[in-house]
Amino acid sequence: MDPVSHAEPSARIPASRVPEGRGPEGHVAAACVAAGRVLESEEPALPLGTAPLYASAPSPEDAANATTAAAVSGPRTFAVDCGGGGIKTALLDAAGTQIGPARRTPVRYPFSPAALENIIAADAAALRAEGCDFERLTVGMPGMLRHGVVVYTPHYIRRAGPHTRLDPEMEAAWNGLDIRAALAARFSRPTLVLNDAEVAAAATVTGRGLEVVLTFGTGLGNAIVDSGVLAPHLEFSHAPLRWGLTYDDVIGEIERIRLGDAAWSRQVARAIESLYPVIRWDTLYLGGGNAARITESVRERLSGSVVFIPNAAGMSGGVRAWDLVAASERARAEQ
């Protein structure tokens, strides 16, 4: 089995987005063909010690040459990162470099599978209007998924958003749905659907030892990769932590807002310390939108035991997720 190895670092330019229809080459269509620049998501800056997924921005000529070469060598991937509050999409070249700006659409509850399909379809149509297209689709979404089937998803089955009352109609619509098959049929493209933390893991893991990825956003996401093989998904977020509360209850976004970053960060540290005796990972990565909010004092407390990764890993992993899944399937077939 060939372990998944690091892709070449992607280039990145500042978050001042290219205006609609106006790139350095004159328009978005030209950028789709040749620019290959990565546009940062609007997230808090990560401090020193962050995993080096990105290098400094190349010259326009180098970026165009690199992206053109990548486009020839592999398919373009339309990556979809599904969160409790919004759906983000971006077009990636074969190297995982973002082409043009990402798009974000707020989730409006109740949120059905058809609503997700329609958001993806609208963003795909916008790409085509700009002269772009994709050959495959990668979707990362919260919850337990097996072989593209939703076993359980925590947010979209609620009436008014995370931690609100269950909506029986949405629960029936989502849980048990073969979302991979539904999206593949809708878009007529090869489709991969994984837990969102597993997509982030694909952008991050080295294939050496037991690697764990924890993502902090609306709730807690997680992925486990053993020597380049993706382990069956476990939902740490639903496990009891203390006083009958789950990890999501204690370190999710609602609790962060209630406590403030300092107290919330201390709870994150305690949660990580409670997980280590159970898993005893070789490397732990922390990501997601709220990882950047972990305070410096807690970072120092965790220093030497964790690596921070950019929130963009949830999107950029859309390319390497295919390699991670293929390597995992080969390894299991050889057992």
In which residue ranges do the predicted regions lie?
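Short glycine-rich, Thr/Ser-proximal phosphate-binding strand/loop in the N-terminal lobe
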Residues: 68, 72-115, 165, 229-257
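Short glycine-aspartate micro-motif
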Residues: 77-81, 134-138, 211-215, 221, ...
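Adenine-nucleotide phosphate-binding core of ATP-dependent small-molecule kinases
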Residues: 103, 108-135, 244-335
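Short beta-strand scaffold segments in enzyme catalytic cores
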Residues: 87-91, 143, 202, 220-226
